[in-house]
């Protein structure tokens, strides 16, 4: 499977017990939603490899998983801290104005005055709204290295064009 078709949705953590269970860190909105997206791929030595989920459960407010063929602590330790990915085709279509974070990362952000503010390097979730983390251009006229711009569709974010990878915002370049 080619890497550009895989989206990271979580990470395996440390081992749990002696029978091959691992802790898991989900980056989906609801932690257990990670199990809605199958099959999983693990990034092992830079390559995505398919893996089958055998079982999962909550243990002391953490999620632990059992992967098929991982039957002891030693086998599980090899997979500790490995990223979990899924093929992008398993994600449902979104409504107008809704976007997956992976679609926004890498977009160029331009304000209404036409000033290129930088490139979206990551997204952050806050209590009220998502935030674009924008790495400023190296010769930013305002001396900025990074900008945090709220992803408030229509209020701040005026247009998203995924074809040209451009996000137009109503945001002062000095902020």
UniProtKB/Swiss-Prot annotation:
Highest taxon of source: Bacteria
Residues spanning the membrane: none
Example GO molecular function: ribosome binding
Gene3D superfamilies, per database record: PRC-barrel domain, RimM
GO cellular component: cytoplasm; ribosome
InterPro entries (UniProt xref): PRC_barrel-like_sf (IPR011033), PRC_RimM (IPR056792), RimM (IPR011961), RimM_N (IPR002676), RimM_N_sf (IPR036976), Transl_B-barrel_sf (IPR009000)
Key words, A-Z: Chaperone, Cytoplasm, Ribosome biogenesis, rRNA processing
Domain PRC barrel: 96-175
Biological process, per Gene Ontology: ribosomal small subunit biogenesis; rRNA processing
Localisation: Cytoplasm
NCBIfam families: 16S_RimM
Annotated domain remarks: The PRC barrel domain binds ribosomal protein uS19.
HAMAP family: Ribosome_mat_RimM (MF_00014)
Matching PANTHER family: RIBOSOME MATURATION FACTOR RIMM
Family: Belongs to the RimM family.
Job description of the protein: An accessory protein needed during the final step in the assembly of 30S ribosomal subunit, possibly for assembly of the head region. Essential for efficient processing of 16S rRNA. May be needed both before and after RbfA during the maturation of 16S rRNA. It has affinity for free ribosomal 30S subunits but not for 70S ribosomes.
SUBUNIT field: Binds ribosomal protein uS19.
Full protein name: Ribosome maturation factor RimM
Natural source organism: Haemophilus influenzae (strain PittEE)
The encoding gene: rimM
């Amino acid at each position: 499977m080619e890497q550009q078709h895989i989206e990271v949705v979580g990470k395996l953590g440390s081992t749990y017990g002696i029978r091959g269970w691992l802790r898991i860190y989900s980056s989906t909105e609801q932690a257990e939603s990670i199990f809605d997206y199958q099959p999983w791929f693990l990034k092992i030595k830079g390559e995505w490899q398919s893996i089958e989920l055998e079982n999962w459960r909550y243990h002391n407010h953490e999620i632990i998983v059992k992967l098929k063929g991982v039957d002891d602590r030693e086998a599980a330790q090899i997979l500790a801290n490995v990223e979990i990915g899924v093929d992008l085709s398993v994600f449902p279509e979104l409504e107008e104005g809704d976007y997956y974070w992976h679609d926004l990362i890498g977009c160029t952000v331009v304000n209404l005055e036409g000033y290129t503010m930088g490139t979206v390097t990551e997204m952050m979730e806050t209590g009220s709204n998502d935030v674009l983390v924008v790495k400023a251009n190296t010769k930013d006229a305002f001396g900025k290295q990074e900008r945090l711009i709220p992803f408030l569709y229509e209020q701040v974010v005026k247009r998203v064009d995924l074809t040209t990878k451009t996000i137009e915002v109503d945001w002062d370049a000095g902020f």
